[in-house]
């Protein structure tokens, strides 16, 4: 690789792309982005709707979540502990998120192109509201959503 290309590659590796709000430049990476996905025969208004609904075994409640007007309401319903969570939720939640993300980026070609164009930058869901899926606002969170997006980006690049 020529020296200049190596320098550009190095600069991109040091680049961090933050996302959180759907109005950000990379807001479509947010699970709240209005990008419907079709999974298991159902169309979900957002990946957030799908993800939150999968926390529950109660089909009626899952359908209620699917039909709510906004991802914010879906997220609130996902935190409802008067409804029992799946017993295995903690062990399957990342698989569920992977499935939602793959559906979103496979079903929306322009998002796939955008995601691939970010390589090899680090993707960070930058928010104080979540230290598991996001960075906790201070960089100390796990940023699992960012890592799953980078993992998907690698897979899509190979499949391209």
From Swiss-Prot:
Residue ranges crossing the lipid bilayer per the database entry: none
InterPro entries from the UniProt entry: NADAR, YbiA-like_sf
GO MF annotation terms: hydrolase activity, acting on glycosyl bonds
Keyword Protease assigned: no
Keyword Hydrolase among UniProt keywords: yes
Reactions catalysed according to its record: 2,5-diamino-6-hydroxy-4-(5-phosphoribosylamino)-pyrimidine + H2O = 2,5,6-triamino-4-hydroxypyrimidine + D-ribose 5-phosphate; 5-amino-6-(5-phospho-D-ribosylamino)uracil + H2O = 5,6-diaminouracil + D-ribose 5-phosphate
EC number(s) recorded for this UniProt protein: 3.2.2.-
Pfam family, one: NADAR
Gene3D superfamilies reported in the protein's UniProt record: YbiA-like
Keywords, comma-separated and alphabetical: Glycosidase, Hydrolase
SUPFAM superfamilies assigned to the protein according to its UniProt record, in alphabetical order: YbiA-like
Family: Belongs to the YbiA family.
Role noted for this protein: Catalyzes the hydrolysis of the N-glycosidic bond in the first two intermediates of riboflavin biosynthesis, which are highly reactive metabolites, yielding relatively innocuous products. Thus, can divert a surplus of harmful intermediates into relatively harmless products and pre-empt the damage these intermediates would otherwise do. Helps maintain flavin levels. May act on other substrates in vivo. Has no activity against GTP, nucleoside monophosphates or ADP-ribose. Is Required for swarming motility.
Protein name: N-glycosidase YbiA
């Amino acid at each position: 690789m020529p020296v200049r290309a190596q320098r550009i590659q190095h600069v991109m590796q040091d680049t961090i792309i933050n996302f959180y709000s759907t109005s950000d430049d990379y807001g479509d990476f947010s699970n709240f982005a209005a990008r419907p996905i079709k999974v298991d025969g159902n169309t979900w208004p957002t990946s957030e709707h799908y993800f939150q609904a999968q926390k529950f075994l109660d089909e009626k409640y899952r359908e209620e979540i699917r039909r709510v007007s906004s991802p914010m309401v879906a997220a609130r319903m996902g935190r409802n502990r008067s409804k029992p969570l799946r017993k295995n939720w903690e062990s399957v939640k990342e698989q569920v998120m992977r499935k939602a993300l793959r559906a979103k980026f496979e079903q929306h070609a322009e998002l796939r192109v955008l995601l691939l164009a970010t390589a090899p930058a680090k993707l960070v869901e930058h928010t104080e509201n979540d230290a598991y899926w996001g960075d906790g606002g201070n960089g100390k969170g796990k940023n699992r959503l960012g890592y799953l997006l980078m993992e998907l980006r690698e897979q899509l690049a190979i499949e391209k």
